[in-house]
Design a protein with these regions (language model features):
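Vicinal oxygen chelate
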Residues: 15-19, 76, 81-137, 161-170
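Core segments of cupin and vicinal oxygen chelate
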Residues: 14-57, 61-62
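Short beta-strand/turn micro-motifs at beta-sheet edges
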Residues: 1, 64-71
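Short glycine-/small-residue motifs
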Residues: 56, 139-140
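N-terminal beta-strand motif that seeds the catalytic metal site of vicinal oxygen chelate
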Residues: 1-19, 81, 146-147, 151-170
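A short local loop/turn or secondary-structure capping micro-motif enriched for an aromatic residue
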Residues: 65-68, 100-102, 146-149
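Short, flexible turn/loop "capping" segments at secondary-structure junctions
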Residues: 3-5, 71-76
């Protein structure tokens, strides 16, 4: 058995323009600034939070001469960052908020799983995807299925459990 990790603590991103990214993450996603650290070379790190933890997201300006957008979104090391909202109502409000802010979706809204996109391995979550100013892929989701006992299901058992979830039996 490996390390007993409780949760992902935070995600740190290199950004091309701290002010632009800061506006996006505060005005569009609702982050709050915990603190900002400017370094003598002019680079900066900003700690952002969604709740009462010190930080959930860290924005760091790229070192001088580094273009964080040089690699396209598919070549980057972070595939996506997913943000959970409380429920379907919060999901729909988030969708409307992004639309009002002019953020274009790259996928969704959709439901992952047999009741939505047909994926037997899907989570049952409602999701939509969009990019931040540097092209990082972001997801907002709600209603992810929980896996009993934290164990992986065999595929057939998983499909049956998913159907039970869809039917409101789980």
């Amino acid at each position: 058995m490996g390390i007993q990790i409780k949760r992902i603590g935070h995600v740190g991103l290199l950004v091309s323009d701290v002010e632009c990214s800061l506006r996006f993450y505060t005005e569009v996603l609702g982050c709050k600034v915990t603190n900002r650290n400017k370094r003598p070379d002019g680079s900066e790190t900003v700690f952002l939070r969604f709740d009462d933890w010190h930080h959930d997201l860290v924005l760091s300006s790229a070192p001088p001469g580094v273009d964080v957008t040089a690699a396209g979104p598919r070549e980057r090391l972070i595939q996506q960052i997913a943000f959970e909202v409380e429920d379907r109502d919060a999901f729909l409000k988030a969708l409307a908020h992004l639309h009002a802010k002019g953020v274009k979706l790259i996928n969704g809204p959709l439901i992952h799983g047999i009741e939505g996109d047909g994926n037997l391995g899907g989570s049952g979550s409602r999701s939509f995807y969009f990019h931040d100013p540097d092209g990082n892929r972001l997801e907002t989701f709600a209603d992810m299925m929980r896996v009993p006992n934290g164990e992986e299901f065999p595929r057939q058992e998983y499909a049956e459990a998913m159907q039970a979830y869809v039917n409101g039996e789980r």
